Structure formats: structure tokens, C-alpha cells
């Protein structure tokens, strides 16, 4: 009897110690703002597991089954502001094998945990200055967060043709062209060798420029970078984007990724790479369309 009473008492104590938070699903595990509004932090972990099965079919029966289970993504994301809501930050860490693989002599043969480490300063009006490691203003499919995909992954085409992340600075601005017509301008100068590089700049720099046109105004909840139309846009919304990227004296096979191109004498081979994107995002009443070139 004593054991039953003790267990019941501990259970009641545990229940009474729980606190009810006003945070809802999708808004982060922790969402904290300092009492004096000097800083804020939101912590939002997420993961994606995947199972794949395949069989050979010879016309009569299925055979040779193969199965694969993986943790496709495992992320820890922190964001908020410091000192002022105009000075924001974002830190995102990757923990899955696909996130951290790619160690080489240029990142001291260490796991590549850091996906994003960037500060974003709204220094005047519609102007923002970004500094650190984050996604470049490239094709819309790549810039859409993996948490906001409609299918389980991005397209196979995107996996080969994108400019991903890099270390550098970005200047961003938006201009009202009349009525609800909005234009956004994004410019970037970065190191050109991808994320988590620690051993200096082996090649030249990478330059990126992107223009986005929203003739019918902004999307609900930044829906132009969210593949599904979960907000069900009542009026048609369209974004047209154009990106130009130039990686001068690139020393990796794909500029930001791939093997470093080593000559037989141990020196690095350098080549100029140019990438051009044109893309569109359209949404209306639950229907969404995304196209890229």
C-alpha cells in the first residue's frame, strides 16, 4: 500500500510541475523573448527518416528484394534577434550522415556540422545586409527549406544544378513598382568553395545576382518559398525569378561542391563557371505550380 501511495504522490507531483506553453506545432520547441526585448531565440529541431524497398520483376514474379532505412535529415535550428529586432541571426546544424559528410584537407578533415551561421541586419528602410554562411540567392527549389517541401525531396535535376550555400556577404532590397507590384533585388559576394571551408580561399570569389518580380503582391506567410499552397491564396500570386552566378577561378568540380581539382604536381586547377536560373512560383486557392530552367 505504501508503494502505491508513494507512486501516486510522485505522479501527482510530476503533473503539477508541468508548465503549459503557448507554443503550437510548427512554431518551434522553444520560443523565448527576453523581458526587456533585448534578444529572442527560437529552437526548432526536425528530422526525416526514409524507407525504400525494391524488387526485380521478371514477368512472372517479384524477386531479389532490397530494403534500405536511413535518417535522411536531422537538423537543429536556432534563430531570433539580438539587441534589436532589426539584427537577426540564424544557426542551423546538420546531424545526419548526409549533412556532415565531405571532410577533406580544406576543412581540416572534420565533419561539416554547420549548415547556416548568418546574421541579417536591416540597416535602413528596405535594405538588409547578410554576413556569414547561408544559402545563396539561387534557384527557388534549392532555397526552399527542406521543412517546406511538398514531396519527400527536391528533384534529381536540382541535386546536380544549384549553387547551394557559401561563406560571404549578401545585400538585399525590395522596391514597390506601383500598386501591389513588388521587385526584390539580391546580390552576393562569397568565397566560392561551399560551406565549412577553413583553409582560406583557394580560388577566386563567387558573384551572384537575383531579381524577383511579384506582380500580384506578396504571398501569405512567405509562401513563395513554400512549395504547397497550405494558406490557400484567395487571389492568384506569382513570383518570377532570375539568377546569374559567376564563380571565378573555381577549384572544385561543381564550384561549391565536388572534389578539388588537383593537378599531378599537387597544384589546384582553376576554371571559371557561369550559372543562370529562371524560375516561377504560382499559387491560387490550394493549387501550386513551380517551374525552373
What are these regions (language model features)?
Residues 1-20:
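Bacterial Sec-dependent N-terminal signal peptides
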Residues 16-24, 183-189, 263-265:
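Short, charged, low-hydrophobicity "junction" segments
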Residues 17-43, 58, 218-237, 250-253:
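Outer-membrane beta-barrel biogenesis signature
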Residues 22, 118, 279:
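Short, surface-exposed charged micro-motifs
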Residues 25, 111-112, 273:
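Short solvent-exposed loop/turn micro-motifs enriched in small/polar/acidic residues
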Residues 29-55, 61-195, 200-217, 236-239, ...:
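Outer membrane beta-barrel
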Residues 56-58, 261-262:
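Short Pro/Gly-enriched beta-strand edge/turn motifs at strand-loop
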Residues 202, 212-216, 220-293:
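Detector for outer-membrane/organellar transmembrane beta-barrel domains
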Amino acid at each position: 500500500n505504501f508503494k502505491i501511495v508513494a507512486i501516486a504522490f510522485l505522479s501527482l507531483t510530476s503533473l503539477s510541475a508541468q508548465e503549459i506553453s503557448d507554443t503550437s506545432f510548427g512554431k518551434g520547441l522553444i520560443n523565448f523573448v527576453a523581458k526587456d526585448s533585448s534578444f529572442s531565440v527560437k529552437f526548432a529541431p526536425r528530422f526525416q527518416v526514409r524507407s525504400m524497398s525494391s524488387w526485380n520483376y521478371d514477368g512472372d514474379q517479384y524477386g531479389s528484394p532490397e530494403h534500405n532505412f536511413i535518417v535522411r535529415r536531422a537538423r537543429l535550428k536556432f534563430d531570433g534577434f539580438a539587441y534589436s529586432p532589426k539584427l537577426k541571426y540564424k544557426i542551423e546544424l546538420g546531424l545526419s550522415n548526409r549533412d556532415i559528410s565531405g571532410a577533406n584537407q580544406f576543412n581540416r578533415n572534420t565533419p561539416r556540422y554547420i549548415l547556416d551561421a548568418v546574421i541579417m541586419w536591416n540597416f535602413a528602410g528596405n535594405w538588409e545586409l547578410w554576413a556569414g554562411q547561408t544559402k545563396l540567392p539561387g534557384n527557388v527549389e534549392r532555397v526552399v527549406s527542406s521543412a517546406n517541401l511538398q514531396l519527400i525531396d527536391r528533384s534529381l535535376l536540382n541535386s546536380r544544378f544549384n549553387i547551394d550555400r557559401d561563406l560571404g556577404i549578401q545585400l538585399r532590397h525590395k522596391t514597390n513598382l506601383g500598386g501591389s507590384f513588388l521587385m526584390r533585388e539580391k546580390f552576393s559576394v562569397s568565397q566560392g568553395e561551399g560551406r565549412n571551408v577553413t583553409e582560406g580561399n583557394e580560388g577566386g570569389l563567387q558573384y551572384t545576382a537575383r531579381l524577383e518580380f511579384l506582380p500580384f503582391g506578396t504571398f501569405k506567410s512567405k509562401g513563395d518559398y513554400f512549395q504547397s499552397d497550405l494558406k490557400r491564396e484567395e487571389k492568384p500570386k506569382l513570383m518570377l525569378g532570375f539568377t546569374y552566378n559567376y564563380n571565378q577561378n573555381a577549384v572544385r568540380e561543381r564550384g561549391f561542391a565536388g572534389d578539388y581539382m588537383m593537378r599531378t604536381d599537387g597544384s589546384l586547377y582553376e576554371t571559371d563557371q557561369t550559372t543562370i536560373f529562371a524560375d516561377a512560383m504560382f499559387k491560387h486557392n490550394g493549387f501550386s505550380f513551380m517551374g525552373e530552367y
